[in-house]
């Protein structure tokens, strides 16, 4: 499935609800560098308690799997490392949600996101500096060489315009 289709499945409900989010991971890499395959969308989110119910209601249909409210609430309370996903069953596409918690890099993603238009949908994408640092962290923590290829691609396409102070 083209990444624009993944965006069409998951981003419009977030925008309609006014959810504070930033796209990270493979979709962000594609936006800041060369096309590559991805089968999900990764999102850093800040969801106050009442917003959790709205998010789950937006994906409450037979076409989506969403975790129970209690699971999402528990993941949102974690100071770091929280995670839950919502899956579009017919296409097997998924959105991985990462609660911002206490991670300053996630805070930067939510504060300094950049708006991009993809497939007719406006999405908030974490700045390339955040993507570079996060990809390096994932590689350090045992990730694949794909993370390094993604970093190289971002540096090749947007390297001169990166905020080097933000990378420090």
Where are these regions (language model features)?
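Compositionally biased terminal segments of proteins
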Residues: 1-168
């Amino acid at each position: 499935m083209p990444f624009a289709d993944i965006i069409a499945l998951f981003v419009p409900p977030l925008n309609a609800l006014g959810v504070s989010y930033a796209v990270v991971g493979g979709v962000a890499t594609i936006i800041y560098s060369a096309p590559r395959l991805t089968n999900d969308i990764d999102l850093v989110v800040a969801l106050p308690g009442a917003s959790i119910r709205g998010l789950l209601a937006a994906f409450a249909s037979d076409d989506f799997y969403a975790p129970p409210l209690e699971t999402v609430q528990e993941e949102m309370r974690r100071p770091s490392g929280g995670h839950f996903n919502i899956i579009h069953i017919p296409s097997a596409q998924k959105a991985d949600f990462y609660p911002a918690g206490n991670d300053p890099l996630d805070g930067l993603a939510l504060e300094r996101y950049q708006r991009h238009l993809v497939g007719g949908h406006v999405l908030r994408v974490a700045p390339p500096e955040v993507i570079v640092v996060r990809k390096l962290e994932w590689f350090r923590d045992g990730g694949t060489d794909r993370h390094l290829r993604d970093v190289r691609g971002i540096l090749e396409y947007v390297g001169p315009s990166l905020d080097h102070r933000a990378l420090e």
